[in-house]
Amino acid sequence: MPNDPSDNQLKTYKETYPKPQVITTSNGAPIYSKTAVLTAGRRGPMLMQDVVYMDEMAHFDRERIPERVVHAKGAGAHGYFEVTHDISKYCKADIFNKVGKQTPLLIRFSTVGGESGSADTARDPRGFAIKFYTEEGNWDLVGNNTPIFFIRDPIHFPNFIHTQKRNPQTHLKDPNMIFDFWLHRPEALHQVMFLFSDRGLPDGYRHMNGYGSHTFKMVNKDGKAIYVKFHFKPTQGVKNLTVEKAGQLASSDPDYSIRDLFNAIEKGDFPVWKMFIQVMTFEQAEKWEFNPFDVTKVWPHGDYPLIEVGKMVLNRNPRNYFAEVEQSAFCPAHIVPGIEFSPDKMLQGRIFSYTDTHFHRLGPNYIQLPVNCPYRSRAHNTQRDGAMAYDNQQHAPNFFPNSFNYGKTRPDVKDTTFPATGDVDRYESGDDNNYDQPRQFWEKVLDTGARERMCQNFAGPLGECHDFIIKGMIDHFSKVHPDFGARVKALIQKQARSHI
């Protein structure tokens, strides 16, 4: 007998709607038969005037849209953010303006590299994208379950993602592609170590941290700005899967994380995360020992402690996965007054790329879809028409300035000014202190057992690579810590002997 809410979805529908509805065509006309096509005689050919069939099949042929190029498979939920601590001295954003204030939100969790049918338990970062429906527009905080990323310059992003996808000839995942890229971009080491540690296999979506990852700016009502990073920590605790359990679930329940989230919410066991920020002044940023806008590095908590802000509660499942999750579109460019961008190059690159991919996947009016529209503030602009447009903004003028009472600006939401100097050039940053924080991760974050498990996790896929890639990666590991390189080397040699 089915026990979980996800198993009983159809039964629940039947109990909720006991009276069957008359079946119609897409234009609302009732039909008398849904079990046979229209033919000339019992054994004769179909007729082109079978509009019931044509209506059904034409829509079926167009049901799928392009899947996301990354983060293709995911789960979503609705909820709210509640302010529990006053941070108005740092930020004027409407969402934070009063303790106790609640703001509705949508979150989408996801794996990164796999296709939409891949296993939820793959060793992969997890997407952690939140859309806050604030009274001054939608704020999208598009992060991951890691505080760092593989690269610091966005020009590498397409090539990095190519290595996480399939070989274009064999159509197979290729460890040589993956590790060869990391061999040439050692700034990835910090994130790679995070990925191959126990944290690379979170136990579903409810038991993992979330991070904005990038550095942002917060601005208060007096126009004073500071730099900030966002953190989310689950009150239900962090849990990870063992390699063996993750492999078992990939076979027996590849939708494990989606199922776990849906059933928990449906049972009333609402997941909760506390939000924290780290704060760095402009003066501290100028003097800090490394580039504070480098997304391959963290801000040490001892120097920049976590400041509690509020809590995020997920309390409602989507009614329609396609409409509310598959068609949801998150974009780092979507900020609100009080939140601004930093010089983080990866953030700057994402400002363009996310909107661009939404145009490809959903069309130029994706922002008009109910799940994406800023329904608590409403959009007022001169953007009109295009595929699937239905909002003409009360037939207002589509040009500005004008003499017809349409449109005014708000001087109080002016971006803060900042100085910018330097020669225009392409500045290579591949050798910018790539080993110090990975070394701290090895020495201070991982215990003895976690180090051993991480080395074992590396040895399997790295051992399948060409010898020069193995040697190059072990050299990188040894620069992090001699014991790290030696352990992985010994494990790979042991694997090789066992295959003789």
Swiss-Prot record:
It holds the Pfam family Catalase. Optimum pH is 6. It catalyses: 2 H2O2 = O2 + 2 H2O. InterPro entries: Catalase (IPR018028), Catalase_3 (IPR040333), Catalase_AS (IPR024708), Catalase_clade1/3 (IPR024711), Catalase_core (IPR011614), Catalase_haem_BS (IPR002226), Catalase_immune_responsive (IPR010582), Catalase_sf (IPR020835). It comes from the Eukaryota. Disruption phenotype: Shortened lifespan and reduced egg laying capacity. Abolishes ctl-2 enzymatic activity and reduces the global levels of catalase activity to 20% of the total catalase activity observed in wild-type animals. Increased size and clustering of peroxisomes. Increased sensitivity to pathogens. Reduced survival and resistance to E.faecalis in a daf-2 RNAi mutant background. One of its GO terms (cellular component) is mitochondrion. Heme binds at Y354. GO terms for molecular function: catalase activity; heme binding; metal ion binding; peroxidase activity. The active site is at H71, N144. A motif (Microbody targeting signal) lies at residues 498-500. Coiled coil: none annotated. Homotetramer. Belongs to the catalase family. This is Peroxisomal catalase 1. The lineage of its organism: Eukaryota, Metazoa, Ecdysozoa, Nematoda, Chromadorea.
